[in-house]
Amino acid sequence: GTVFALLGPNGAGKTTVVRILSTLIRADAGEARVAGHDVRAGADRVRAEIGVTGQFSAVDDLLTGAENMMLMAGLRHLGREAGAARVRELLERFDLAQAAGRLPSTYSGGMRRRLDLAMTLVGSPSVIFLDEPTTGLDPRSRRTMWDSIRALVASGVTIFLTTQYLDEADELADQIAVLDHGRIVAQGSADQLKQRIPGGHLQLEFATVQALELASAMLDGAAREDGKLILRVPNDGSVASLRRLLAELDEGSVEVERLSTHTPDLDDVFFAVTGRPSTEAAAAA
């Protein structure tokens, strides 16, 4: 019932990790377990527990949506009646019932991804590998996919997510690891990773020059913003440190007109640990 996100630059090895853990290829060395089973010695048991959906859809365009689903039910040995019931349930859950009789070539990109994910769920896996599941989707389709992932997590499914979208990891992941040149270079929750990076600060805006000067004299490391009644004060953004700062200003009878916080985001983390901007940040630049 959690989401583990693997981030990394192109070529870092994210898809290779997914292929090893899903038993599609064998590792050169080392050990790994999925759902308690060794991926080398217990590959069949691993496959029985997992589902995999990648950035390139496994949907067959020569079959209708429902036929694609029934094909997966057959591969999972569900039996005709049980398989049909499971297919109906998933088509309804992913809002595909009305399109079930159509060929996937007539689907939108978001619909194809939902069909691909629904096919993965036919066998009720306990662990699902999502390899860049929202690449190429428009913002609305991405949000719809996020909602589907949250629903899976709420039902107890564990998600292993690779993504090039840092906001996606920030939004969905309980734990994040950053992979670079085949090695984990950072790991933790989004908040833990952000706190490792210096640069967090509070921005304090004052109504008068007198208040600005009093605060500047009181607060260690405070820096003025040229031409404005604004101070920037180093701060980790925690509630405790914010309370201490406000108490100090209150004791000095200094009134703050406006306050805002800035903490490093995952782009800052990514750049700090890999030496490169994320794919998303590079595209924006």
Regions found by a protein language model. Name each.
Residues 9-13:
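Walker A (P-loop) phosphate-binding loop of ABC-type ATPase nucleotide-binding domains
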Residues 70, 74, 81-99:
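Conserved ABC ATPase "signature" region
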Residues 30-41, 46:
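Conserved ABC transporter NBD signature motif
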Residues 128-131:
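Catalytic Walker B motif of ABC-type/P-loop ATPase nucleotide-binding domains
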Residues 146-235:
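ABC transporter nucleotide-binding domain
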Residues 124:
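Conserved catalytic motifs of ABC-family nucleotide-binding domains
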